Amino acid sequence: MNPEYDYLFKLLLIGDSGVGKSCLLLRFADDSYLDSYISTIGVDFKIRTVEQDGKTIKLQIWDTAGQERFRTITSSYYRGAHGIIVTYDVTDLESFNNVKQWLNEIDRYASENVNKLLVGNKNDLTSQKVVSTETAKAFADELGIPFLETSAKNATNVEEAFMAMTAAIKTRMASQPAGGAKPPTVQIRGQPVNQQSGCCSS
């Protein structure tokens, strides 16, 4: 056991490009916000250590690029993830409709019992909101996953989202048998992931 922390959890932020994943990560990890944020190329991650129920938990949070062309890169990052935050933009109906597609990605690549959280970001833009809280909540309830609306800009529910996810993972880990520290997460269907992708040579 590492003396610096009791748990190390790997979290993923996924969702369409432009929904504010990087802004959520910046707000939670650094408590900062940038109005103009460069689109994430590939994958970026930040670390924040939190205290919960007397335990020190190190969170390694990966910000995956939302663009279709990066799918092959990010698929390998699903494996080993303890929790996945699926993000959409409350002012962009298409990003909400694409949540189903992202959940399919999770089913395909992530471990079976991974924790999920649906997050509707940019909730500060009330006049531009097109995805109602009721619609999103009903959708999340149907799937049996927790749901929160956030604003990275004014920090609404950002801390709550990450801490709720952390608590859910910790509860799940505690309920696993002692020998279950390495659950059978690597069920690779399809080709091996170590193919060289020429993402930088285009």
UniProtKB/Swiss-Prot annotation:
Residue pairs linked by disulfide bridges in the UniProt entry: none
Q: Where in the cell is it found?
A: Golgi apparatus, trans-Golgi network membrane; Golgi apparatus membrane
The residues the record assigns to binding GTP are: 15-23, 33-40, 63-67, 121-124, 151-153
State any GO BP term from the record. pollen tube growth
Pfam families in alphabetical order: Ras (PF00071)
Annotated GO molecular function terms are: GTP binding; GTPase activity
Give any Gene Ontology cellular component: Golgi apparatus
The ranges of region (Disordered) come to 174-202
Which residues are the signal sequence here? none
Q: List, alphabetically, the SUPFAM superfamilies matched.
A: P-loop containing nucleoside triphosphate hydrolases
Q: Please give the chief subcellular localization of this protein.
A: Golgi
Q: Where is the composition biased (Polar residues)?
A: 192-202
The UniProt similarity line reads: Belongs to the small GTPase superfamily. Rab family.
Role, per record = Protein transport. Regulator of membrane traffic from the Golgi apparatus towards the endoplasmic reticulum (ER).
Q: What protein name is recorded for this chain?
A: Ras-related protein RABD2b
Q: Which gene encodes it?
A: RABD2B
